[in-house]
């Protein structure tokens, strides 16, 4: 998948950090983090977030609300997709957090074509 950047808000200050986990599960776009991290606390206060990725001259932005999904099955699916995370996370550890985008807009942009948008 590569790296993308997740933006959240802490008070009135934007916060951006690199992420690398992404999973389509039951037709929803999921990301993963740890409940102990600042990003988890920021999303609990304000679930609006945006991710941005760039590849081959095209950038993708996905903006929406991130919804916590505490089901064992989706946490296991995420960790099975990224086995290297098992040294830090486990679906039963109480720390592993998976979230999916809701009321989201994906925008594909480049310098050579008009932006394309889709809602999901």
What are these regions (language model features)?
Residues 18-20:
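Conserved beta-strand in the GNAT
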Residues 1-12, 49-52:
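A short, Trp-centered hydrophobic/proline-enriched beta-strand micro-motif
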Residues 61-120:
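Charged, gly/pro-rich active-site loop segments
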Residues 13, 57-58:
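Short glycine/serine/proline-enriched coil/turn segments at secondary-structure junctions
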Residues 5, 29-30, 61, 107:
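General beta-strand recognition
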Residues 1-2, 45-47, 102-103:
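A short, compositionally biased
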Residues 22-57:
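A short mixed-secondary-structure module that forms the rim of ligand-binding clefts
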